Amino acid sequence: MVGPWRFHGHAIVSADDRIAGADGLTPQALRNEADWARFQAALDRAAVTVLGRFGHEANPNLKRRNRLVLSSTARGLERRADAWWWNPAETDLADALVHAAPDGGIVVVPGGRRVFDLFLGVGYDAFDLARAERVTIPDGVPIFSAVAPGITAADLLVRHGLVAEVTEVIDTAADISLARWVCRAVP
């Protein structure tokens, strides 16, 4: 949590913790209606959604939800017709959020990898990690840069202070599970 904002990550990954193929695109095997419905409900509750430029351009904002697009081409923080555009190398997160979501609230973080990495460092309050248990994506894009042989997304979430609160199967036929990770209470 930073100020009045709570950071909630959302992703669906393959069994080998990939969010995209080598081409950077989300493969059809990671598209699931049960996960999509939960994700859309989370977006409806969000004060702002923070995502990368590629994701913003690939996913039209048909519902005109409030977006903060992370891009190294933005000059600090810019209000453009389609969204807030933010370069974290020039403007810090709290300053960007004061403008993009001045009343605080939930900041939904759906990626891509650079955005997931940034908020892993900031600190997630919660992370909904759906997993397609029967899907692998050799040479795909891992959810976090530090995912490597012997280091899973779950390992990284634990290292950054989260614990798996509950895991449930959200689509039995497709073997999709969802783990809700939450920030550990500080004694």
Label every PLM stretch briefly.
Residues 1-187:
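Enzymes that bind and transform nitrogen-containing heteroaromatic metabolites
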